[in-house]
Amino acid sequence: MAACEGRRSGALGSSQSDFLTPPVGGAPWAVATTVVMYPPPPPPPHRDFISVTLSFGENYDNSKSWRRRSCWRKWKQLSRLQRNMILFLLAFLLFCGLLFYINLADHWKALAFRLEEEQKMRPEIAGLKPANPPVLPAPQKADTDPENLPEISSQKTQRHIQRGPPHLQIRPPSQDLKDGTQEEATKRQEAPVDPRPEGDPQRTVISWRGAVIEPEQGTELPSRRAEVPTKPPLPPARTQGTPVHLNYRQKGVIDVFLHAWKGYRKFAWGHDELKPVSRSFSEWFGLGLTLIDALDTMWILGLRKEFEEARKWVSKKLHFEKDVDVNLFESTIRILGGLLSAYHLSGDSLFLRKAEDFGNRLMPAFRTPSKIPYSDVNIGTGVAHPPRWTSDSTVAEVTSIQLEFRELSRLTGDKKFQEAVEKVTQHIHGLSGKKDGLVPMFINTHSGLFTHLGVFTLGARADSYYEYLLKQWIQGGKQETQLLEDYVEAIEGVRTHLLRHSEPSKLTFVGELAHGRFSAKMDHLVCFLPGTLALGVYHGLPASHMELAQELMETCYQMNRQMETGLSPEIVHFNLYPQPGRRDVEVKPADRHNLLRPETVESLFYLYRVTGDRKYQDWGWEILQSFSRFTRVPSGGYSSINNVQDPQKPEPRDKMESFFLGETLKYLFLLFSDDPNLLSLDAYVFNTEAHPLPIWTPA
């Protein structure tokens, strides 16, 4: 034990060389008996500076983890999956940034363009100016003798009804006009008019894939636009009278209207739309949408008391100096169309003054690089813009405002309204991307080009484009051949690409086409087509159009009849292949709502006017009874419903759309009338919101 201790102490006390080097001769290690002591180390040299240690916090432990390391070393330490995820994220962010930059550049460009245009042209909204000579001819006054009406075409089908002037009794304009319109009208009526050349001018024949159309006698077709006489007269003043005898079905429509009006007047007066279940209202534009939409309906139904009350609200409460965005399309067809129609039926210049004021406030929407209007415009500030999520407008929106703007130009003498919308029509006419007359659903307001190419439908976002091709041609005295050609070509495109037959009943329907793939989906909105086809036949288009109209009318009726409530859903799908136990029409749960839409009864009206077949009246009566049974709210009003397949629980949606009064009930009233002179199709053309506007006399 002592030896061990001595060895340990010697090893510790000796120098390093003694400890490592064995004795000479290789003798074993010996126990050190002498301890060698080294002198202490010299003191550190004197320093003339002070060393300061900076603390990195209480937890600093002299670790080097805080020091900078090489980014590349750090990158290499990551796994391959981590590196790939980071690279993917960076690429995605770069792509999003690029898209954002492009979109931002477009918006800045459009903003700069709008600012420049606003400096050049500010909307004139100070009120109605004294009318200048109208740019377009006056409305057509149909011959009182049906035998004297000109023949349109040898192909025109025989109708079982009388033709003649409209039977609506229209009162003269007010004498206390503040804007001098009546005085100007007198001057224009006294002004000399150039006589027409003697002799019967040569009739020009338009032929398009089997449609042979002869213009009205005395017209020529040198250009797309209707020729303008120098100083045509204003619409003649007409006197007010009492409506013709009403049958029980028309009285039924009046009862429904009065119940709906009761709810609106009590719970939503002056607001946009009634919420009948909750006995309240909803706002869209804050402009009394339902009231304006229903003005001409009240006049046609003979409800003079209700009309005068609504007219008083328009006079006292309807002002457009509001900081509010309105949709160009919806506000044009409902508000502008409703005011123009009310003016034509009543002769009250109040409605024309309001219409011009509103039309001026919509004009900033057309200040785009492509002249394709933006979808929304602020009627107070004059700032227009596309939807928040895109720079596109829908084709239906930009091509279904022409009837109203053209008529506003004709009445006021201000060309800008007509010129703006006809630039759009002309632009669409020359665009590529169509398919045998069918157009895509979207168009870019900056580039002016179609987007979402290869998708074609006659449903939402495209429907009224086709309707307005025909109706503009009719409105302008059948002189604008380009419109007729585009319409007829589109109908042929429908036959070629969109028409199919269901199983097992072989119902004819119009589907959709997406990049060459057909879908057996049909919106209820497409039920405007039978009526439009029938209207074309009434004005001289081929009889084959009437055959298609009758087939599609049967389909639209079945879309109502095959539902348990007797009301059509918003969208249906047709079976293309025979399968046991399956019907022609099927409805998905998300599509089984009904919004009180007018398209089916609109087409029933046209089909009855053209054919005289009373089954169309019977079908309309069934639909009216279904509305009364499943949508009526006892306290007042009618509500759209969620489920047309459950008569026990149709589930009211608590909303009465303005078009229920403006369109649905108006078309039902006209359908049940046996008087073809009540808004004769020879004298009036209805806009897509059912507001009648006069047909212009050919120049």
From Swiss-Prot:
Active site: 330 (proton donor), 463, 570 (proton donor), 599
Phenotype upon changing residue 524 to A: About 4-fold reduction in K(cat)
Activity control: Inhibited by both 1-deoxymannojirimycin (dMNJ) and kifunensine.
Key word ATP-binding present: no
EC number(s) from the headed UniProt entry: 3.2.1.113
Lumenal side: 106-699
Family, similarity comment: Belongs to the glycosyl hydrolase 47 family.
Protein's UniProt name: Endoplasmic reticulum mannosyl-oligosaccharide 1,2-alpha-mannosidase
Organism: Homo sapiens (Human)
Lineage, opening ranks: Eukaryota, Metazoa, Chordata, Craniata, Vertebrata
Encoding gene, per UniProt annotation: MAN1B1
